[in-house]
Amino acid sequence: MRILVTLFAAALLVGCQSRVADVFDSRQNAGPCPPVGAVYDVARYVAFADGTDETYPNITYTAEIVDVRMFCRYADKDPLVAQMEIDFAFGKGDAARSDTHAYPYFVAVTRRNGKVLGKEYFNVEADFNGRKLDGRTESIARIEIPRLDESIAGSNFEILVGFDLTPEQLEFNRAGKRFLLNAEQ
């Protein structure tokens, strides 16, 4: 009886394997994936308490996009489909009033010439739990880029990420100022 159960289980597993293998597309990518990265001017987030100077004791929250990774798939005339992971590092300053903070960020698909084809906004939540530092990896399961025909390669596009900053935060970053709360470690 044990032999029959073992053979039956093996037959089921082999059957499952073949169905799972059929789901994966074995065709070669039609070309390279689009380059992906964080836009330098908006890769850092620094917020100060309202009405205060831009000094270290007045920092409420900071964040930085640490890494961006992408996997893409396309063949023949299929649209380019990408999955992305974004690593964030967060800091909570002495002027912060809450143990959680939502950081707004965007993901944009552009042509290599800079024309924005699509842009979506997201929030990533930091939960400090009484600590000063936190980190998180956010996953975006599906980014789809339609292609006119199979001659259009992923290298014709870029996928860019950054924080959705206020004009003051953007000016702070462009001035080259940096306050990262993990600098004291």
Describe the function of each predicted region.
Residues M1-A9:
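Sec-dependent signal peptide recognition
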Residues L12-G15:
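C-terminal motif of bacterial Sec signal peptides marking the signal peptidase cleavage site
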Residues Q17-V20:
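Bacterial signal peptide processing site
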Residues F24-G51:
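Post-signal peptide N-terminal segment of mature Sec-exported envelope proteins
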Residues E54-K77:
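Low-complexity, acidic Ser/Thr/Pro/Gly-rich terminal tails and inter-domain linkers that flank the onset
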Residues Y74-K119:
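Mid-length scaffold segments of soluble, non-membrane domains
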Residues Y103-T110, S155-E168:
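Internal, hydrophobic beta-strand segments that form the core of beta-sheet-rich folds
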Residues V124-F157:
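Short, solvent-exposed, Trp/other aromatic-anchored flexible loops in extracytoplasmic proteins
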